[in-house]
Amino acid sequence: AKPLVSASNPPATPGLDKYSAPHWLGARANRRFHVMAKPAGSACNLDCAYCFYLSKRVLPGGPGSGHMPDDVLERFVKDYIDSVTSDEVVFSWQGGEPTLLGLEFFEKVVTLQKKHARAGQRIENDLQTNGTLLDDDWARFLKQQRFLVGLSIDGPREIHDHCRITKHAEPTFDQVFAAAKMLQKHGVRFNTLTCVHRYNASRPLDVYRFLRREIGSTYIQFIPIVEIRGFENMAPGTWDEAKLPMLGDPRCHPDHPESVVTPWSVAAEEYGYFLSKIWDEWQARDVGKVLVNLCETLVAQHMGLPSQVCVHSEICGKGVALEHDGDVYSCDHYVYPEYRLGNIRQQSLGDMVFSPRQVKFGYAKSETLPAYCRRCEFLSDCWGECPKNRLLRTPDGEPGLNYLCAGLK
């Protein structure tokens, strides 16, 4: 029988290993990748309790915060357009809080995109924001330039304001709710991004129905908050595996005084409860009306289509992070010196994304799965979720089990 050809087992090329095989990941004809740009670095006007990015400003050897210089911005816009071979290029602007740079920065972005776009090429922009700085001028610009806005909101007032507060510990719900209504008034396309954490995971339907009915969101994204204790200075995969708790150990729970994760991390079982309740509601009432990222991708995978989210894909690595100073990292959850790929002032984005080092990073998602995962009936649905969340050992003692495993099952 012929060996199975899959994403983690590509066809052989004489003289090349799979990490450098140009026809698989790096072929010029197939150079499609995504860059998450952080033009203000970790700078933000909020102080959300669970934010993993604020600490980058003091990370030794890290990117800090700042304002992307004009030369770096133009280099990025031109290089990204030149490096991607598809007819569509999507620029994603995140943070920190990118609107801190002001409307003028993004007017400059659009001007540069028009300057460097190839004939017939479609340029799209999306902007992830906490919404607190948006006003009518912003909304008119976003509408005119066809930006897709991602609005961060965690649910009803009492849930949202538990974690998403200002530097002076003031609530932000009213500002974010007003931003949603203003975007609707101006006809700006937007979706919602909701973090699932220790303080809202027990109220899935309150969160979902609020987003659906009060905010009017028709594209809802949920992301779990999972952070290992000491994440501020410890890059994923650099921890002592011998000290990781085994599945079922009390230290797997965020309430335990010696928990492997921070107190605000979602508990695995609660995350499973949260998703199950939302799946039931979505399936019964909202299929075809509301897009829920984790529900949609599960349906797609069961139809034989690839996952729509990186964490449930067999391989990753085609989504890198660009910092304000031009440094490029393997992923926005891997913005640590150990995962710095280079700087766009010296290297092209394409060369960094399709370098053997980054390709190995992408393949490691499936290649490093423990045997417990490889024989799991849900492997093709999960693929070990995000590698940065592999904080447990299996019942056999093998490291590499995802913290959310029990909940995802």
Which residues make up each language-model segment?
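C-terminal accessory region of radical SAM enzymes
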Residues: 247-258, 263-302, 333-377
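Radical SAM/AdoMet-radical enzyme domain recognition
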Residues: 73, 77-92, 101-250
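Short, acidic, Ser/Thr-enriched surface-loop or helix-capping motifs
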Residues: 323
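Short, small/polar residue-rich loop motifs at catalytic or cofactor-binding pockets
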Residues: 313-316
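Short Fe-S-cluster ligation motifs
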Residues: 75-94, 361-364, 399-409
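N-terminal [4Fe-4S]-dependent radical SAM core
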Residues: 1-37
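Canonical Radical SAM [4Fe-4S] cluster-binding loop centered on the CxxxCxxC motif
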Residues: 30-71
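Local cysteine-cluster metal-coordination motifs and their immediate loop/turn environment
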Residues: 43-54, 330-333, 369-389
